[in-house]
């Protein structure tokens, strides 16, 4: 049966709008993740990931993710998916990160690798396509990395995107579009966007300074000049310091013993400093010379900056001083709307309950500390009273001993009489 053209076009449109999910991981099958994620053996002392929802959460099962478990370690873990190219379509990379340990220095980013990666040998120098996510180290580094590998070179974004640095779960999203634009979102809100060509140094500049252009010798960039009619007053030059006119040689000054007496010097009240002629507008002033630019012969536009031949592996390749970070809700797709919806259905559903649980724990901890402090003060007060009672007992004992000694001495004296 032939379908009407409008209906047929509608069905085609629905099919075209269907999102493609290249990778999704929520860790909802217990230890099943260990069959999908491969540990690198490049170093024998890589840190271990464990499945955990952490010390506080919105939903104990849904919030389970990969948690770093050992301090001061490098971590290297990855999962493979069916290779795909993002040529001609949007790429969306999304995941959640929770630094519940109040991280001081460590990465919270992911890397997307091409098909050729040996997962068992993945390490910090393994070539990747894209690196994206938060990185924190001390007060100076709290940024979201967005790094693209372009023609074998890792190119960093020219903008500073600040990441979240609290203890709660946050949703990070990178969108790369086939028109060479991008968008970075945190918690489903845009924090940065723009052009790949403008915000990364992928290509040589479109314009360069004309190598043949030279500033004219008579080009005067001085806005002000000395007034040629101004002259220094005749009485201007005075010494900065003069002998103190009120000083007198001490009466007991012996020049043979003390040398020739010289009065101390003081600041000269008539000293005016260095004379400088007054300034006037320069009649020959032409402004700052601007080096003329020309088209850069080495510049060549690239409409495929955004595109990669294939993506096949998502990896966690990072360093952490203090462990405890939880990664969850990984998603790689070609559909921005689906990614936003997925974020709302995962992070969005549990974020409020997570905060409530943390607030409750903090309040319980505060009350516990108050109770411990109260108990400590009470114990100190009891110890103080016991010490005072002990001192009183010792004083009474000393007084008693003194009385006994006095009585004994008196008795002895009486016997001697």
UniProtKB/Swiss-Prot annotation:
Calcium-binding chaperone that promotes folding, oligomeric assembly and quality control in the endoplasmic reticulum (ER) via the calreticulin/calnexin cycle. This lectin interacts transiently with almost all of the monoglucosylated glycoproteins that are synthesized in the ER. Interacts with the DNA-binding domain of NR3C1 and mediates its nuclear export. Involved in maternal gene expression regulation. May participate in oocyte maturation via the regulation of calcium homeostasis. The modification N6-(2-hydroxyisobutyryl)lysine is found at residue 64. Residues 259-297 are annotated as: 3 X approximate repeats. Residues 207-251, 352-379 have a biased composition (Basic and acidic residues). Residues 191-255 are annotated as: 4 X approximate repeats. Disulfide bonds join 137-163. Sequence repeats lie at residues 191-202, 210-221, 227-238, 244-255, 259-269, 273-283, 287-297. One of its GO terms (cellular component) is cortical granule. This is Calreticulin. A motif (Prevents secretion from ER) lies at residues 414-417. It comes from Sus scrofa. Keywords: Acetylation, Calcium, Chaperone, Cytoplasm, Cytoplasmic vesicle, Disulfide bond, Endoplasmic reticulum, Extracellular matrix, Hydroxylation, Lectin, Lysosome, Metal-binding, Repeat, Sarcoplasmic reticulum, Secreted, Signal, Zinc.
């Amino acid at each position: 049966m032939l379908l009407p053209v409008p209906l047929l076009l509608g069905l085609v449109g629905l099919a075209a709008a269907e999102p493609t999910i290249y990778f999704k991981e929520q860790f909802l099958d217990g230890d099943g993740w260990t069959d999908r994620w491969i540990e690198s053996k490049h170093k024998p002392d890589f840190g271990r990931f464990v499945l955990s929802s952490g010390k506080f959460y919105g939903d104990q099962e849904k919030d389970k993710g990969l948690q770093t478990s050992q301090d001061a370690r490098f971590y290297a873990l990855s999962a493979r998916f069916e290779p795909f190219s993002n040529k001609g379509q949007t790429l969306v990379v999304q995941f959640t990160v929770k630094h519940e340990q109040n991280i001081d220095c460590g990465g919270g980013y992911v890397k997307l690798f091409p098909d050729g990666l040996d997962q068992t040998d993945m390490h910090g120098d393994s070539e990747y396509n894209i690196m994206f996510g938060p990185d924190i180290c001390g007060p100076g580094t709290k940024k979201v990395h967005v790094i693209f590998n372009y023609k074998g070179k890792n190119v960093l974004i020219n903008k500073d995107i600040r990441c979240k640095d609290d203890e709660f779960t946050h949703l990070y999203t990178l969108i790369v579009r086939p028109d060479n634009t991008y968008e970075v979102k945190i918690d489903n809100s845009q924090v940065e966007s723009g052009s790949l060509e403008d915000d990364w140094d992928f290509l040589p500049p479109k314009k360069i300074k004309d190598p043949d252009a030279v500033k004219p010798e008579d080009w005067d960039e001085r806005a002000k000049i000395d007034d040629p009619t101004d002259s220094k007053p005749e009485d201007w030059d005075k010494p900065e310091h003069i002998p103190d006119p009120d000083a007198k040689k001490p009466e007991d000054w012996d020049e043979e013993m003390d040398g020739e007496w010289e009065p101390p010097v003081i600041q000269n009240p008539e000293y005016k400093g260095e004379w400088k002629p007054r300034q006037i507008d320069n009649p020959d002033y032409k402004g700052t010379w601007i080096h003329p630019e020309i088209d850069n012969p080495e510049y060549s536009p690239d409409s495929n900056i955004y595109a990669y031949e294939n993506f096949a592996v998502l990896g966690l390749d990072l360093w952490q001083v203090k462990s405890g970070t939880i990664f969850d809700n990984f998603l790689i797709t070609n559909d921005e709307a689906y990614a936003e919806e997925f974020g709302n259905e995962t992070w969005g559903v549990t974020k409020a309950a997570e905060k409530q649980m943390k607030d409750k724990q903090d309040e319980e901890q505060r009350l516990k500390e108050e109770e411990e402090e109260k108990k400590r003060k009470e114990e100190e007060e009891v110890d103080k009273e016991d010490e005072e009672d002990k001192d009183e007992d010792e004083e009474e004992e000393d007084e008693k001993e003194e009385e006994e000694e006095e009585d004994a001495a008196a008795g002895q004296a009486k016997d001697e009489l």
